[in-house]
Amino acid sequence: MARDLLLEVGAEEIPASFIGPALDDLKRVITERMADARLKHGEVRTFGTPRRLAVWVKDVADAGEDIIKEVLGPSAKAAFDAQGKPTKAAEKFAESLKLAVDQLGRATTAKGEYLSARVEEKGRPAADILKDTLHAAVHGINFRKSMRWGDVDTSFARPVQWLVALLGSDVLPVVFGDVTSGRTTRGHRFLSPDAIELKAPAEYEVALEKAHVVADITKRRAQLVEKVRAAASKAGAQLLEDESLVDQVTNLVELPSPVVGTFEERHLDLPPEVLVQEMKSHQRYFSLVDSAGKLQPKFIAVSNTPVRDEQLSLRGYQRVLRARLADGRFFFDEDRKTPLIDRVEKLGRVVWQGQLGSYLEKVERFRTLAVWLGQEAGRAGEAATIERAATLAKADLVTGMVGEFPELQGIMGREYARAGGEPDAVALAIAEHYLPRGAEDALPTQDPGALIGIADRLDSLCGIFAIGKAPTGAADPFALRRACIAIIRLVLGRGYRFSLSAAVDESLRLLAPKIANAKRKAGEPAPREQVLEFFRGRLKALWGEQHRTDVVEAVLSAGFDDLVAAQKRLEALSHIVGRADFQPLAVAFKRVVNIVEKQGRDVQGGETNPQKLVDEPERNLHTAFTQARSTVSGLVRVDDFSGALREITGLKPAVDTFFDKVMVMAEDKALRENRIRLLVEIGALFNQVADFSKIQAETAAAA
């Protein structure tokens, strides 16, 4: 009979950011170990608050499943002597399985023939499996920081106070430090401090709700949002949406209870971002705005308990915020006393990366690169703005405000640039060169910020790859994946037409003094190739979310030096592969590409010689190709890749007839090479859009 499993670790207040990852660890270890033990189960739910981490597994089987498995013994050669009698090795193997030698079988593997036996392995009782599993789960949580307490020879995020471990109505013995598991949990620290005895896991969630604890994170989050929005509406304002703050506050409380407070209106002359950051970072307060999005002198704080004396509580919240805003005003006033341009030299004392130099050196590189990109992208008229904004782009890193709130870099640069009399375009570019900060973030509204942002990120990518610190599957300390995706979004979003490989070359040229002596592993590709391959990987992942993988691969294999053109080719090809008649087209094109790949490298370059086309089908194909090539080239020049594909697909009848009627691999070398040369030229025509050999024809038929 299936029973439910409950594990709860009760502790002193666990940091909010630790709770989600810890629950993931608990769930992973428990489910993996149950799977390894073949212990079947139903739904798995997790619960987490500042005082508890819990996992509820429904419908756990009584025991692991029985299996029949094959066990290999000694090799057949070692198992029998020259007379065919079993050796000691065979006898010991049979004895270990409680079998006679003649009951053993033989199994053939890649390494040869071995003695074997099929034996039944009984599943272990659930209680035995879970006792070990829960011990491993509790001890296997990886906290960013952990602590020890008392004489306990173990560590956790915070001191563990109690453990619940139930399988049905039975307590499973689990020990963590000086705490032994039982069936007793605890409710809200202040509203329901008494112990709660659980008879079975199914009682857990309801029992805690009665004790003023919303243990389900999703439910608690929804409650928090609902209550905070209602409080904002009651105060005649709207909530400034902030998902990350909602997530954080959700895990700071067990029973969210919002209160609305105010601050002095005179502080509204500070940049709104400063006020929001002061309230969010230090106090975890929600900001309020009016219907037009203008910040209001109000906030919402979330308490862990319903407030009895709201005015007393508010005085505390407001007093703390008053001090924070005074600090913000001090930083803002002090920072404005020194113009940004006078701070630039100080960047020479701030290390960006040990081998790649200071922020001042980085600024000098990406300023030059940004101006170059502007020229290549047809934005040469923005050169003066780009140069000035790039010079000032990182100057706010050495201000007091950004030292206190790194999240405000760029934003404070914009404000201080305006205060110092810089043109609006320069101030805007300083702020916008950080955009997009994330996958869902908006792009810059103007070219200077976008081009500086591309240059800054490309300098980082090329520099880090050049010194051999490329991201791995486990680590990306310089956030190069995010930087690469941001560059792609910026180029495509702003429609910049420049050579990606040339941009990488220019960036590496500017980095040359810093990377000249960089050590690389033997056989490792050059930094240029590594960076371009990195872009290829990000494009494949990004485009693969919206398009078929084989179509993306076909487009990338034909080149992606012009990212805008590559995207247009992808969209055109994605449209045509969905047609029912594309499969025969794909088959015909792949025949061309396959022959070119196998035979084309053995044929000297040059164009097809029409005089050596002796058969009518090959002359017809050459005529059709010549006409299509001229038309396709014109269409590609104006980015009409759909039209180019229509022209290319028009070659199919001539290609089919050619393969049906003409022997490509003719005995006459001159004829053979001329025919292959014709196919090479046709393949090159195809390749202006995509490498059709990468497209799965069968998939195309089903599309």
Swiss-Prot record:
It comes from Myxococcus xanthus (strain DK1622). It is found in: Cytoplasm. GO terms for biological process: arginyl-tRNA aminoacylation; glycyl-tRNA aminoacylation. HAMAP family: Gly_tRNA_synth_beta. The keyword Signal does not apply. It comes from the Bacteria. NCBIfam families: glyS (TIGR00211). This is Glycine--tRNA ligase beta subunit. It is an enzyme of class 6 (ligase). GO terms for cellular component: cytosol. It catalyses: tRNA(Gly) + glycine + ATP = glycyl-tRNA(Gly) + AMP + diphosphate. Keywords: Aminoacyl-tRNA synthetase, ATP-binding, Cytoplasm, Ligase, Nucleotide-binding, Protein biosynthesis. Tetramer of two alpha and two beta subunits. Its EC number is 6.1.1.14. GO terms for molecular function: arginine-tRNA ligase activity; ATP binding; glycine-tRNA ligase activity. Belongs to the class-II aminoacyl-tRNA synthetase family.
